[in-house]
């Protein structure tokens, strides 16, 4: 019974373990940090010391500990923390998206003055220019209206096509109306605009204009034609109508695609400007994104 009631005494004081390298050794070889002791004598407060008097360890371990602690890292590496790099990349991305979405390229060069086009087609990204609104500026509201006066232009052009559909002079010239938004000479038709401009430069005399127009046939001329000539003329006219409507369909689809992209960009601008108030580290200004939170190195 006496042997079962005996307990083993365990010494919880690890006096034989170095507080730096955590290796067990003889108690005689362990001592307090002599470097911290000397610094304390020189007037350094105890709160600034690395080791207290209660810590025991090897003399070499304390010296190596202080040597490593005194090796300061370069300031440039400390300043470039992961948070700062991510914040910089995010700021540049937001800045680029807002600048691209606003389409505010106000640089008026000679090309823009000679060939005035819609601002959607002459936008050029310049990273040095930061076209950002003020932080307290009003969020721009998107309007579903495509262009001022566009509805009237589309209806006029459509009405003109329907009125002259039975005319033998039906062709691309019907759509070359400067007042109609969907006509070829409009800025919304950039691909065919250059071709029409080249044709206008080559055609300068009224005689040439008469030659380029489709021939008109009177009822007597049509009656005098043979059945084969009439069928050939009819097939040619139908082919011209098909080509015009295919081109018109392509341009309308392109316009719808641009309108959809413009809508997405306006929504993105609204969301970005609203979310800026939720990011305390970013402030939108004329000079771009600025950080107001100090980075703990």
Curated annotation (Swiss-Prot):
Composition bias type Polar residues, residue spans: 203-215
Tissue: Expressed in the brain. Expressed in cortical cells of the germinal ventricular zone and the cortical plate. Underexpressed in the dorsolateral prefrontal cortex, primary visual cortex and cerebellar cortex compared with Down Syndrome patients (at protein level).
Keywords: Coiled coil, Differentiation, Neurogenesis
Keyword Nucleotide-binding set for record: no
InterPro entries linked to this entry: EURL_prot (IPR009704)
Main function: Plays a role in cortical progenitor cell proliferation and differentiation. Promotes dendritic spine development of post-migratory cortical projection neurons by modulating the beta-catenin signaling pathway.
Protein name per its UniProtKB record: Protein EURL homolog
């Amino acid at each position: 019974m006496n042997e079962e009631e005996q307990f083993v005494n365990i010494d919880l004081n690890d006096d034989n373990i170095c507080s730096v390298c955590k290796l067990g050794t003889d108690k005689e070889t362990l001592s307090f940090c002599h470097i911290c002791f000397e610094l304390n004598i020189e007037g350094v407060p105890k709160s600034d010391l690395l080791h207290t008097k209660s810590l025991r360890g090897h003399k070499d371990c304390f010296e190596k500990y202080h040597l490593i602690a005194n090796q300061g890292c370069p300031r440039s590496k400390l300043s470039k923390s992961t948070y700062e790099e991510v914040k910089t990349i995010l700021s540049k991305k937001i800045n680029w998206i807002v600048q691209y979405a606003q389409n505010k390229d106000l640089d008026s060069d000679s090309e823009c003055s000679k060939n005035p086009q819609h601002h959607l087609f002459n936008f050029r990204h310049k990273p040095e220019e930061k076209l950002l609104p003020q932080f307290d500026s009003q969020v721009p509201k998107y309007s579903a209206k495509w262009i001022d006066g566009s509805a009237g232009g589309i209806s006029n052009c459509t009405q003109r096509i329907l009125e002259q559909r039975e005319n033998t002079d039906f062709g691309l010239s019907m759509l070359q109306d400067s007042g109609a938004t969907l006509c070829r000479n409009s800025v919304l038709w950039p691909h065919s605009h250059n071709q029409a401009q080249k044709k206008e430069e080559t055609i300068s005399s009224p005689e040439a204009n008469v030659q380029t127009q489709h021939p008109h046939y009177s009822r007597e001329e049509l009656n005098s034609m043979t059945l084969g000539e009439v069928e050939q003329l009819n097939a040619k006219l139908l082919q011209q109508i098909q080509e015009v409507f295919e081109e018109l369909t392509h341009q309308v689809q392109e316009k719808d695609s641009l309108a959809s992209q413009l809508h997405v960009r306006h929504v993105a601008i609204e969301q970005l400007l609203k979310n800026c108030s939720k990011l305390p580290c970013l402030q939108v200004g004329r000079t771009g994104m600025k950080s107001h939170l100090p980075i703990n190195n």
